[in-house]
Amino acid sequence: MSDKPAYLTRDGRARLEAELEELVTKGRKEIAERINAAKELGDISESGEYEDAKNQQAHLEGRIREIKSILARAQIIDEENGDNHEVRIGSRVTVRIDGEDGEETWTIVGSTEAKPSEGKISNESPIGSALLGKRPRQKVTVETPSGTMKLTIVDIQ
């Protein structure tokens, strides 16, 4: 697992803690019951149900380890104490994209919480990393997988 910080909002940390609690309590219990039920059917060496339950158990334990690692490295983004003079993790940034009408607003978050469809972009993404440290009215050129984008920062919250 990585040693680099995992940037999270308070809500993001709470969601991960709730997911971890659910996996450790309910998830482990359900899979243990499935494994025991498959064992009761007899020969487990050729049991598809047993093999499926063991695979799900491995997946569940992997997710538990992943969440624990993220929480251990968590650095909480203080969204209320925002500096609107430059883009940082936690900033809500409004940009104008050259060649397009209107504006886009994105929140810069850690990679764990990134959901572009919800306007949350990772600080590690091409756009997110290019915006970090920039100020209002500054122009930014970003190389993305789909080509070069030219942005103008309109507002930072």
Swiss-Prot record:
<dbReference type="InterPro" id="IPR001437">
    <property type="entry name" value="Tscrpt_elong_fac_GreA/B_C"/>
</dbReference>
<feature type="coiled-coil region">
    <location>
        <begin position="13"/>
        <end position="75"/>
    </location>
</feature>
<keyword id="KW-0805">Transcription regulation</keyword>
<dbReference type="GO" id="GO:0003677">
    <property type="term" value="F:DNA binding"/>
</dbReference>
<feature type="region of interest" description="Disordered">
    <location>
        <begin position="113"/>
        <end position="142"/>
    </location>
</feature>
<dbReference type="InterPro" id="IPR023459">
    <property type="entry name" value="Tscrpt_elong_fac_GreA/B_fam"/>
</dbReference>
<dbReference type="GO" id="GO:0032784">
    <property type="term" value="P:regulation of DNA-templated transcription elongation"/>
</dbReference>
<keyword id="KW-0804">Transcription</keyword>
<dbReference type="InterPro" id="IPR022691">
    <property type="entry name" value="Tscrpt_elong_fac_GreA/B_N"/>
</dbReference>
<comment type="function">
    <text>Necessary for efficient RNA polymerase transcription elongation past template-encoded arresting sites. The arresting sites in DNA have the property of trapping a certain fraction of elongating RNA polymerases that pass through, resulting in locked ternary complexes. Cleavage of the nascent transcript by cleavage factors such as GreA or GreB allows the resumption of elongation from the new 3'terminus. GreA releases sequences of 2 to 3 nucleotides.</text>
</comment>
<keyword id="KW-0175">Coiled coil</keyword>
<dbReference type="InterPro" id="IPR006359">
    <property type="entry name" value="Tscrpt_elong_fac_GreA"/>
</dbReference>
<keyword id="KW-0238">DNA-binding</keyword>
<dbReference type="Pfam" id="PF01272">
    <property type="entry name" value="GreA_GreB"/>
</dbReference>
<dbReference type="GO" id="GO:0070063">
    <property type="term" value="F:RNA polymerase binding"/>
</dbReference>
<dbReference type="Pfam" id="PF03449">
    <property type="entry name" value="GreA_GreB_N"/>
</dbReference>
<dbReference type="InterPro" id="IPR028624">
    <property type="entry name" value="Tscrpt_elong_fac_GreA/B"/>
</dbReference>
<dbReference type="InterPro" id="IPR036953">
    <property type="entry name" value="GreA/GreB_C_sf"/>
</dbReference>
<dbReference type="GO" id="GO:0006354">
    <property type="term" value="P:DNA-templated transcription elongation"/>
</dbReference>
<dbReference type="InterPro" id="IPR036805">
    <property type="entry name" value="Tscrpt_elong_fac_GreA/B_N_sf"/>
</dbReference>
<comment type="similarity">
    <text>Belongs to the GreA/GreB family.</text>
</comment>
<protein>
    <recommendedName>
        <fullName>Transcription elongation factor GreA</fullName>
    </recommendedName>
</protein>
